[in-house]
Amino acid sequence: LQSMLIFKQPGIGGEVTWHQDGTFLLTEPQSVTGFWFALEDADLDNGCLWVLPGEHHKGLRQRFRRIDGTLRLEDLGAVEPFDLRRKIPLEVPQGTLVVLHGRLPHYSEVNRSARSRHAYTLHTISASATYLADNWLQRGPDMPLRYLSSGEPV
């Protein structure tokens, strides 16, 4: 569905605030999975990922929608701050694959080191799930969303 190259440059690579990927790529039923490939070592100094183990069981907290051309971040029920006392860093060497459940809260800090921290991410959804029409990320008619079934293009 979506891929990104993330270039967290030395000294200027900014913080990515706590979020759940399902907020931005919602399906019915929820099915987004993130694959985060470490193209370089990721550690505390250069802004590694942090996660909140088990929080994905609590459901999706927010939804980013496109309505009449306007983007909106909406709360899904009562939204309390994440309990950050349970956060853990994911320090990983180059070449590591981190798999993220779509409801797992995660973030990364500023790169305070003299080294870059580059990563490649790929977000996938289930072919049996419905990609919602008001998700912020939509493809135009010249580039429709395509699914794979049994490894073959549909």
Where are these regions (language model features)?
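Conserved double-stranded beta-helix
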Residues: 1-51
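Anionic group-transfer/hydrolysis microenvironments
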Residues: 4, 21, 55, 103, ...
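Conserved hydrophobic/aromatic beta-strand scaffold that supports enzyme active sites
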Residues: 4, 34-38, 87-89, 97-99, ...
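Feature marks short, surface-exposed loop/turn motifs that line or immediately flank catalytic pockets
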Residues: 9, 43, 58, 126-128
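Glycine-rich, charged/polar anion/phosphate-binding loops
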Residues: 20-23, 36-37, 84-86, 104-107
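A short beta-loop-beta micro-motif enriched in histidine and acidic residues
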Residues: 21-32, 85-86, 92, 115-116
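Double-stranded beta-helix
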Residues: 42-105
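Non-heme Fe(II)/2-oxoglutarate
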Residues: 62-65, 97-99, 103-154
